[in-house]
Amino acid sequence: MITSGSNPRIAQLRALHVGKGREAAGLFLIEGPHLLEAAFDAHITPRLTIFDPDALGRSVEGRRLLERILEARGAGAEALEATPPAIEKASDARTPQGVAAAVALADVMPDKLRQGRRGRARPLLLALDALADPGNMGTILRSALAADVDEVLLGPDCVDPFAPKVVRAGAGAHFHLPIRHGLTWAEIGARFTGAPAIEQVLVAEAAGHVAYDQLDLTKRTALIIGNEAHGVSHQAAALATERISIPMWNKVESLNAGIAASVILFEAARQRRASERGPA
């Protein structure tokens, strides 16, 4: 059992709190029973897990997860018992939940995840422009998966999608949603014109000319969401075929990026679901 916060395995997990550590190790940190359960459900086994068996043993869900951890260990995965203070030392969360693990970035590469998703003739893409807030990023990734977005493209100056706070807010989206990050706007533009070519590129902004729900979002569509404070950059705006807005009442001027993206993406999902059902 790991009892010391200076144990090499604890240091290995702590290194994943920062981007350079994640890049050097090829790993990212997941924390808490929900995320570890989500990884197992996605057939992803962490490269290293530390866990407190007493904490997990206090609930039915925790005991079930403990069985999966021990099963993975029996199959050769590294899973080590640790005391609560040791887990707290490894954790980025304010309130550690009895388990932390390191997952290989190679296991969530976008091309690998795309193999497990159905290809569509009318894809829905999401591009993020200098999105800085980790909570917003995680919320958007979670909504993108729920709304069946095909791929998320992250432009320059976006927060690292594998930062611990983003991963926690994403609530398991990272295990299913293809995310391409560190892209230039030229590379994103090339993705829009690749096969199948995107028919409309929408930029969401308060001064948009068209209400988001007045467009046909069943087309091959890309949505661009801009920086929380400054909106979309000139490079991103240059790709747009339409500027859209979300009508609001009672003198509310704007929504945060996470909510705005979710509203528009779920309208696209609604239209696509209705289109697949056909006329009543």
Language-model segment annotations:
Residues L202-V252:
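Active-site/ligand-binding-proximal alpha/beta "capping" segment
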Residues G32, A132-T139, L255-A260:
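Amphipathic alpha-helical repeat scaffolds
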Residues P33, D54-L56, A86, A106, ...:
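Short glycine-rich anion-binding loops that position phosphate/pyrophosphate groups of nucleotides
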Residues A101, S143-A147, C158-H174, H234-A280:
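Structured adenosyl-cofactor binding patch, chiefly the S-adenosyl-L-methionine
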Residues E71, P85, A102-G208:
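RNA substrate-binding interface of SAM-dependent RNA methyltransferases
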Residues I2, F28, D129-A130, G155-P156, ...:
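Glycine- and other small-residue-rich loops at beta-strand/loop junctions that grip anionic moieties
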